[in-house]
Every structure is written in C-alpha cells, then in structure tokens.
Amino acid sequence: MTAITDLETPAVTVHLDVMEDNIRRVQAHLDRHRIANRPHIKTHKIPAIGKMQMAAGAVGITCQKLGEVEVFADAGVADDVLLTYNILGPAKTERLMALARRVPRLAVVLDNDVVARELSEAARRAQHDLPFLIECDTGFRRTGVQSPDEALALARQATARPGLRFRGLMTFPNRDPDTREFFERALPLFERAGLPVEVVSGGGTPALATVDRFPMLTEHRAGTCVYNDAMVVSSGTATWDQCAMRVRATVVSRPTDDRGVLDAGSKVLTSDLYHMKGYGHVLEYPEAQVAHLSEEHAVVDFGACAERPKVGEVVSVVPNHCCVVTNMVDEIYGVRGGAVEVVWPVAARGRVR
C-alpha cells in the first residue's frame, strides 16, 4: 500500500474517514427533516462515491450534464436521476431519450417553452414520456422562471405538449425568505389549477443548514457536502476538519522570507475566488494566504505565520471550490491512516456536454 507521503505532487486526495462521515451526517440530517436526499454528483464525478451515497439512503442522484448521466448509468449507480439543465438541440435530445429508455426514473428540468417544445418532439419520436420539473429563480439570478405565475403558465404550456409529464418545481439554492415566499405563493396556484405538485426540490450545500425553514421541500440536492471546501467553511456550514478534499503540494521556492511558491497552480487549485481572500486554505499554516495563481504555481504569503515552510516541504491545501478541482485531474487518491487505500479515476471528468 502506497504511503500518502510517497505521492508525487500536486496530488488531489480525499480523506475517506472524513468523506464517509460527511455522507452519513448529511443523510441523517435530511432524514430527521423527512426530506429526500438527492446528492449532486458533479462534485465528485466518481460512480463508486455515488454508490456510497445511495447505500447511505439517497433516493437517487442529480446530474448537471448528459455526459454525467451516461457515465453513471453505465456504472449502474441509480435508477432515479434528475438532470438539472435545459437540454436543447437534436443531438442532445436524442441522447436524452436514449438515456430515458435505460434509466427507469429519469426526469429533466426546463424554464422556457423552447426547451419544452424540443423535449416534446424528442419524446414523441421516441414514444416515451418524459417527466419534468419547472426551474424557478428564487433569488440566485441565474436560470429559472421569475414568478409563480410564470411557473404555472409554463407548466400548463409544457403539459399540453405530447410526451411531457409535469412532476413539480425546483430551485437553486434555497434562500430565506425568497424561496419560501415563492413556493408559498406557487403551490396554491398549482392546486387551484388542478396541477398536482409531487416534487419540490431545493438545493445547495450551505442551504442544508436551513432546510427546516422550507416545510414544502420534498427533496434536497447538495453536492459539495460530500467533500466540503473553503467556500463552505466560510459560510459557517462546515469546519476545516470536515473538509475531505486536500491538495498535497510541494513548496518549490522561497524567493523571500514571506513568500513561498507551491507546485499546484490554477490547473489544480482552480482560480475560483468567490468572496474569499485567497485561493485556498493551507492547513499546516492557517495564517498563510494563497495570494495568487498562475497555471503551475501558487504564490503564498506566509508573512503572518510564526513559522515558515522550507523548500521541499509538502503542505495540504483545502481548495476554495472542490467541484472544479475534481474536473482538473484524471484521478483522486482516497487515503486513510496515512496510506492510499484506493485510486479512483474521475470517470465523468470533462463530460460537459
């Protein structure tokens, strides 16, 4: 068995004890609130981890792109999949319907009638009904219909099209009070219209902490929580000890007393900054700041640290955004007790179509 200290750097590691505890904790939390767990696999992109989540009690999985569904369907991870992306174009809708014949319970989302029309035509050609959810923008300002009235109007339009079957509403992320108020207005509208809402799907790892404020939710989709990252820690919903993904990187240069350079740049750590002050958190030197990245270098300011690393020292960096790091590498090292227990190919890496 390979020792973790023998791994060449940069190496993306996942501490298995931490990840397994994260999976159990999230499942238990949602079980307590009687909300179904539908984890988002875009974070890990690894079928073996998806199977762990299913074994822990998840009702199904969430995928963001068709390529992810294809990989996870090939691996037999789940019979129940929600694809949370507008699918457009004949090539994609053909792939979608091929998947619909393979995955017993495959549902999609949509937020406009152009998508509904194309999905309907594909479903009609395939002679296979396609369940769908209406995506609702409840404050994130990305995709989604803008009001409960628009949600109802689109649901009526889409339901009138052959091959489409309305199942419910979804959003990302849950925001209080916006999400609650949106659904509190929407659900009576659908009831009066005679359109049963079977599913109300929320999402987001930080939003796990507030699911009790949304009694209408039937399921929750969270991805980052399987690993956690600096962004989640900054939101107050995880601790550094609960961060399973850690990038091992070597100090390759110390040009000044305050400055150190690591061999993990933007091609590993990702340049996602969000509201963070640096590009990752160095566990051994918590006062350090990963000040900036180039492709193969991370420049770290150790000025606030009482101790400074030497050239050749290996450090562990919790990335800002673990989902992107996963898509940067071919394989992830699962470690336990200082040894590499498993090496997982990132099977859905690059499946962005």
Regions found by a protein language model. Give the residues of each.
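C-terminal accessory subdomain/extension
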Residues: 256-353
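Active-site-proximal beta-alpha core segment in soluble small-molecule metabolic enzymes
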Residues: 40-178
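Conserved, mostly hydrophobic/aromatic
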Residues: 19, 42, 72, 134, ...
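Generic N-terminal amphipathic, Lys/Arg-enriched alpha-helix
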Residues: 1-14
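C-terminal helical cap(s) of enzyme catalytic domains, especially alpha/beta-barrels
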Residues: 73-78, 232-241, 333-334
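N-terminal glycine-rich anion-binding loops that anchor highly charged ligand groups
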Residues: 18-51
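Flexible, glycine/charged-enriched surface loops at secondary-structure junctions
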Residues: 36, 192-199, 311, 326-329
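Active-site loop/helix belt of alpha/beta enzymes
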Residues: 131, 137-239, 243
